A protein has these predicted regions:
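C-terminal non-catalytic regions of proteins with extracellular/luminal or membrane-system context
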Residues: 1-514
Length: 514
């Protein structure tokens, strides 16, 4: 059996699972002790008999409860711990690291590249932002990554041939070494560590400008199981979120300065903090060529990147795993041509999203019968899903067609959006229908001067009758990505789907119609 590492959160979780069983054993122990004490009142033969019987009774209850625990609540845990473990070969480990890097090669999304600023040759580069020294590698809970052995953003840049400004990175590490924990069991610390602009001395900035005329700003946001992202940071900072719970619904935030608050009431976690906004202002006032890297899986408000002519390029890089940040360096250098696409719609103002009022920390007030069993110290929480079929891009595309929103004013980056260092042309062939299966050929030609991959996305618009079955105006039904295409070369992709894939469900008449 291989080495088993145990995290404190795992211990807490196991204790919570068997809490009722432990209470039963504890009650049996108390009863045994009471009987042994009371037995002192009886004569010696009876006293001994009662004590032995109480001990045997306690032992029997303990054995039964422990067996129930092992068969029930702890069954899966024991299987994980006691099961035979295979050894991971070095070859498989190396292959896994390579796969992680390849996934990031395919997934990083470039959303802005004014003046074709990227790619740039490996050179000296100033990397600003505390997150550059402590990036997001994955989600929370089961999505965590061992950061101690992972390739970070700075290391990924250096592996690609860039030289980073160590005076900046040393300052960030000295400011704070660890990332605030978003814990399932111990509450959530939503603090966004960032060195206040006032702490950047004239010497540091003069040295940075002498080091390189190019700056890269890294901003990150974490998120995962255990808590919704706060949409009112003011309530997090003033502690009012504590009113509805003490565990899953608990949140805290520590400001980066005593001179101001990082967030005002009503601002969400996915907006720039005051310290981050000051950092962007400072960097853009000192450097003409700025790259922004957003490291996070959630759709942050990025409209501010359009307010600075100095911000030439924007890259979206979610949790990159153990080795994925090598890909980020390779994309900036041009070793890899970005081909990722957005997996959600990025909006300019999150308060205008259809789900905004239905997310957050909502708690039931009439659940006394189940509250005792709730993990959140008696708090039973919920989230409302009211969007129906209009989730993600389906809402924005349909709302724009119906005149409910102005698409350009609302949407920052559409679903399926992403830029490349080259250009492509796509030519769609005729639809072929055979026994309910539909295929179509799409020929992609690299019309630029740089090798790269392109993504073909096939959408359909179903017929809609006012008052009929709800249907979104645009629906993704198939997609594929080309191989690396050299300039002037083409590749034909065949996309296929079934007619049934375009069917709609009548939730009121309970009958499927196409």
């Amino acid at each position: 059996m291989g080495n088993v590492t145990v995290a404190w959160e795992d211990v807490i979780s196991v204790i919570q699972m068997v809490r009722t069983h432990l209470i039963v054993i504890g009650a049996a122990l108390v009863c045994m002790i009471l009987l042994m004490v009371l037995a002192r009142r009886w004569a010696k033969p009876l006293r001994g008999f009662i004590r032995w019987q109480s001990f045997i009774g306690f032992l029997l209850i303990t054995v039964i409860v422990v067996n129930v625990m092992l068969i029930g609540a702890l069954n899966n845990t024991l299987n994980v711990v006691l099961a035979d473990r295979g050894e991971l070969s070095q070859e498989n480990a190396d292959n896994s690291r390579q796969v992680i890097e390849e996934i990031t090669n395919e997934g990083v999304v470039m959303t802005k590249n004014d003046e074709d600023f990227l790619p740039i040759e490996p050179q000296k580069i100033n990397v600003f932002g505390w997150a550059s020294t402590n990036p997001i590698y994955g989600g929370t809970g089961s999505g965590t990554v061992d950061a101690s052995t992972a390739v970070g953003i700075l290391e990924g840049l250096e592996n690609a041939g860039f030289e980073t400004n160590t005076e900046l990175s040393d300052m960030y590490r000295e400011y704070r070494e660890d990332r605030p924990a978003i814990s399932i069991n111990d509450g959530q610390d939503w603090t966004l560590p960032e060195v206040p602009v006032a702490d950047y001395s004239d010497t540091i900035m003069e040295n940075a400008k002498a080091f390189s005329d190019t700056a890269l700003i890294v901003l990150s946001r974490t998120g995962g199981e255990g808590a919704d992202l706060p949409h009112d940071m003011g309530s997090i900072m003033d502690g009012s979120t504590m009113d509805v719970g003490t565990k899953y619904l608990r949140g805290s935030y520590t400001n980066n300065s005593d001179e101001y608050a990082d967030f005002e009431a009503g601002q969400s976690y996915l907006e720039l903090s005051r310290t981050e906004a000051d950092l962007v202002d400072m960097v853009c006032s000192q450097f003409d060529n700025v790259i922004v890297v957003y490291n996070g899986a959630n759709t942050m408000e990025l409209g501010w990147t359009e307010n600075y002519d100095q911000i030439k390029s924007v890259l979206l890089c979610a949790g990159a795993g153990a080795t994925g940040f090598n890909a980020l360096g390779n994309i900036i250098s041009g070793e890899v041509n970005p081909s990722g696409r957005t997996a959600d719609t990025w909006v300019r103002d999150l308060t205008q999203t259809p789900y905004y009022n239905n997310i957050g920390h909502f708690a039931y007030t009439n659940t006394e019968d189940v509250a005792a069993a709730a993990q959140a110290d008696g708090i039973v929480s919920f989230v409302n899903y009211n969007e129906g079929i209009y989730t993600g891009y389906r809402f924005y595309e349909t709302a724009a067609e119906e005149g409910l929103i102005n698409y350009e004013d609302t949407v920052m980056y559409p679903f399926g959006y992403g830029m490349s260092y080259t250009t492509f042309e796509q030519t769609m062939g005729d639809l072929n229908v055979t026994e309910g299966a539909i295929t179509v050929d799409v020929t992609v030609t690299n019309t630029g001067d740089t090798p790269g991959k392109d993504v073909v996305q096939l959408y359909y618009t179903p017929p809609y009758t006012n008052g009929g079955i709800e249907k979104s105006s645009v629906n993704l039904i198939a997609f594929d990505k080309t191989d690396i295409l050299e300039p002037g070369t083409s590749q034909t992709l065949t996309l296929s789907f079934d007619e049934e894939d375009m069917a709609s469900y009548d939730t009121y008449g309970r009958r499927g119609t196409s």
